[in-house]
């Protein structure tokens, strides 16, 4: 049974401006494992990754029904599976979490569906 669906759109250049103003911004959004991946990237790919994780976490919080605040950025971890697809590996939701992150030009869109387990 679907519990919630959330979508978010981020502008990569806006995320870059936030990062340029305060590089600690990335550490506020990313978990240690996500930070490791972020550090392994460079330039535009770094900002694209950060914007994608931000969008994914915002989309999760919307699907959860609270928005960011009741659930924090570090409460949600998005890593990649062995095929490179994003996977939510940590969240406060007890059930299935489906995520898709798409990049196009200066934009990143994320969609999250939360599915309750049947009992």
UniProtKB/Swiss-Prot annotation:
- Could you tell me what reaction this enzyme catalyses? apo-[ACP] + CoA = holo-[ACP] + adenosine 3',5'-bisphosphate + H(+)
Taxonomic classification, please? Bacteria, Bacillati, Bacillota, Bacilli, Lactobacillales
Q: What is the official name of this protein in its record?
A: Holo-[acyl-carrier-protein] synthase
Q: Which organism is it from?
A: Streptococcus thermophilus (strain ATCC BAA-491 / LMD-9)
- The EC class name is transferase
The question of whether Lipid metabolism is a record keyword is answered with yes
Role played = Transfers the 4'-phosphopantetheine moiety from coenzyme A to a Ser of acyl-carrier-protein.
Q: What is its EC number?
A: 2.7.8.7
Q: Where does this protein reside within or beyond the cell? A: Cytoplasm
Q: Which GO terms describe its biological process?
A: fatty acid biosynthetic process
């Amino acid at each position: 049974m679907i519990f919630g669906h959330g979508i978010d759109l981020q502008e990569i250049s806006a995320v870059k401006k936030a990062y340029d103003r305060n590089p600690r911004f990335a550490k506020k959004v990313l978990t240690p494992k996500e930070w490791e991946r972020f550090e392994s990237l460079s330039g535009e790919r770094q900002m694209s990754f950060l914007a994608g994780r931000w969008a994914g976490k915002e989309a999760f919080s919307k699907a959860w029904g609270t928005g960011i605040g009741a659930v924090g950025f570090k409460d949600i971890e998005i890593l990649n599976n062995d095929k490179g697809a994003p996977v939510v590996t940590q969240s406060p939701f007890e059930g299935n979490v489906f995520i898709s992150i798409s990049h196009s030009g200066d934009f990143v869109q994320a969609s999250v569906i939360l599915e309750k387990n049947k009992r």
